[in-house]
Amino acid sequence: SGNQVDFGDIYTEGITKITTEDFQYAKKMKRAIKLLAISKKVGDTYCAMVSPALIPREHPLYVVNDVFNAVFVKGNMLGNSMFYGSGAGKLPTASAVAGDMVDAARHLGKIITLFWEPQKLVLAPRDEMAKRFFVRMKDNANPEALFGDGERIDAGIAGEIGFVTPVMTEAEYQKKAEGAEIISMIRIEG
């Protein structure tokens, strides 16, 4: 069974702010930038968000490209598991729509029980999710003074540096980054 989640309650950030320079840093870090939908247990509830993230080469999602999508699940008994297949593009989308139409026609006039709990799941604020952050700043910046011990990344881009923060919550990151001249930020998973 599950609970209803209103999609409007999920923080979403697209890929429009990702630049060529971000990809240069990702390559230097041996990571890929992927648009991820993430749900994590936080206390007694869950936190969910959609945003670009840097993932390492060792992560199974690293190889998901083109019209393919994947769902990566980590369970206490299952361990790590990934479901992978076509999910974007003209033909996969047409196939999914046609499949939905066939299912609707087969079950015309019937009520299909989905085992969802009637109460809405209240999501934890994204501020409570903890992770590392990759930030790009001007080369005269002092990211250690803002974020603490981390790792400087030099991708050979004139006038700027990259920096990987230590693990912190979204709220801690926002507070530390407030007023700083940050060129861009990408969350790090894995």
Language-model features: where?
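Catalytic, metal-anchored helix/loop core of enzyme active sites in primary metabolism
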Residues: 46-136
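Short, exposed beta-strand "edge-strand" segments with a Pro/Gly-rich flavor and a Y/T-containing core
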Residues: 2-5, 11-17, 97, 153, ...
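Generic structural motif
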Residues: 38-41, 53-58, 76-78, 138-142, ...
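Context-gated lysine
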Residues: 17, 27-30, 34, 40-41, ...
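Short secondary-structure transition/capping segments
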Residues: 18-31, 80-88, 92, 150-158
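A conserved regulatory-domain signal marking ACT and ACT-like small-molecule sensing domains
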Residues: 101-190
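Substrate-binding/catalytic subdomain of NAD(P)-dependent oxidoreductase enzymes
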Residues: 1-63, 68-70, 89
